[in-house]
Each structure stands twice: as C-alpha cells, then as structure tokens.
Amino acid sequence: MAEERNFRKVRRGYVVSDKMDKTISVELELRTTHPLYGKVVRSTRTVKAHDENNQAHVGDLVSIMETRPLSKTKRWRLDSIIERAK
C-alpha cells in the first residue's frame, strides 16, 4: 500500500533577490484581521526558496511550495513562475 504525501503549503509572492546561486528571496504578503477592530492588516515576510535552474529573476510573480529543509534557512522551493517582470 502506497503512502500518500501530506498536504504541502503553496504561496504566491514576488522575487526580491536572485543574487544567490540556486536560491531566490520571495516576499509574501500576509493578510490578517485585527481581533478587536476587524480591519484587514497587511504585513510581509521574506523567505528563501530553492530555484534549481536559476530561472526566476527580480520582480517575477512566483508560486512556491513547502518542502523539507534544504539548508539552515531554506524550506520552500520554486513551483512555477506565474508572471515575468516587465
């Protein structure tokens, strides 16, 4: 009997740095509702993602997927490039 893989998180964000080899920095926008006032509060988080072929560049809108730890700070990998930078 084959084991099924657990659900993996998928996020969308913009590439803010591609200066590292096989690694990109992606800025994710988090939207949360304030518990008392109900206002939607936007905040950002920057994560590092694995880009095996160095195909993503600064400004690209990308989809990243959660994966096993690849290094001290990398826990995401590039899933697809949704839109290229203009």
Swiss-Prot record:
One GO CC term on file: cytosolic small ribosomal subunit
Protein family (similarity comment): Belongs to the universal ribosomal protein uS17 family.
Swiss-Prot/TrEMBL GO biological process terms: translation
Physiological role: One of the primary rRNA binding proteins, it binds specifically to the 5'-end of 16S ribosomal RNA.
PROSITE patterns reported in the protein's UniProt record: RIBOSOMAL_S17
UniProt-recorded Gene Ontology molecular function terms: rRNA binding; structural constituent of ribosome
InterPro entries for the chain: NA-bd_OB-fold (IPR012340), Ribosomal_uS17 (IPR000266), Ribosomal_uS17_bact/chlr (IPR019984), Ribosomal_uS17_CS (IPR019979)
Full protein name: Small ribosomal subunit protein uS17
